[in-house]
Amino acid sequence: MASGLKLPRLYAIVDADCFGPEPSLATLTHFAKELVAGGVTLLQYRNKQGSAREILSHARELKRALPPEVTLLLNDRADLAIAAGFHGVHVGQDDLSPEGARLVVGPEMFVGTSTHNPEQLQIADKATVDYLAIGPIFATKSKINPDPVVGLDRLRAVRKLTSKPLVAIGGITRENCRSVIDAGADSVAVIADLLVDPRQRASEFLQILHS
């Protein structure tokens, strides 16, 4: 595993699918810059529909445009994470396995993985990953055919199953994010509730999460 990953309370996701069928690079970059201006220090770039060429082009521009201290993770594509100069990769249950991703990126880059129930989390906990994600905690519209809702009670239960950093994702808003941290998550991943006025929203999230 890589060393030195300290998960911030807010794990912001820049999801290209939220910006229309052909999101412009300028739009994505401006959005990411606004998040960072609001205090975000870690970003995941997610693009489920784009070609490898498009994803790499976008990722490289994000890397160029953002301050070097911002940790950048790429969803799904370990190979493109390396090519873009990102700090790590995040893989899901239907992507390259965590161990496969580790073989691709080596020991120096970060690897995280998504889980949706206690069984998946326990399996992933044995892999050489730097953090685990669990969700959806609440109902979400950011994913087509989402997995069953985990809920706060099950989040509390899975917290006891791992000592690794735990990211909660799915339906998390400014109204409920504090309850997610109180239930045991180290960080909350957010997509939808950052889309409008991202600088202000990020600042509000961080104020709540650190209260």
Swiss-Prot record:
- Which leading EC class covers this enzyme? transferase
Q: Name one GO cellular component term.
A: cytoplasm
Please tell me where 2-[(2R,5Z)-2-carboxy-4-methylthiazol-5(2H)-ylidene]ethyl phosphate binds in this chain: T140, K141, S142, G171
Q: Pathway involvement? A: Cofactor biosynthesis; thiamine diphosphate biosynthesis; thiamine phosphate from 4-amino-2-methyl-5-diphosphomethylpyrimidine and 4-methyl-5-(2-phosphoethyl)-thiazole: step 1/1
Mind telling me which Gene3D superfamilies this protein's record contains? Answer: Aldolase class I (3.20.20.70)
EC number from the UniProt entry: 2.5.1.3
Catalytic activity as recorded in UniProt = 2-[(2R,5Z)-2-carboxy-4-methylthiazol-5(2H)-ylidene]ethyl phosphate + 4-amino-2-methyl-5-(diphosphooxymethyl)pyrimidine + 2 H(+) = thiamine phosphate + CO2 + diphosphate; 2-(2-carboxy-4-methylthiazol-5-yl)ethyl phosphate + 4-amino-2-methyl-5-(diphosphooxymethyl)pyrimidine + 2 H(+) = thiamine phosphate + CO2 + diphosphate; 4-methyl-5-(2-phosphooxyethyl)-thiazole + 4-amino-2-methyl-5-(diphosphooxymethyl)pyrimidine + H(+) = thiamine phosphate + diphosphate
- Required cofactors, per record? Mg(2+)
| UniProt keyword annotation of rRNA processing present | no
One Pfam match, by short name? TMP-TENI
One of the record's GO molecular function terms: thiamine-phosphate diphosphorylase activity
User: Which GO terms are recorded in the biological process aspect for this UniProt protein?
Assistant: thiamine biosynthetic process; thiamine diphosphate biosynthetic process
Q: Which family does it belong to?
A: Belongs to the thiamine-phosphate synthase family.
What this protein is called in its record is Thiamine-phosphate synthase
Q: What is the lineage of its organism?
A: Bacteria, Pseudomonadati, Acidobacteriota, Terriglobia, Terriglobales
Per the record, the gene is thiE
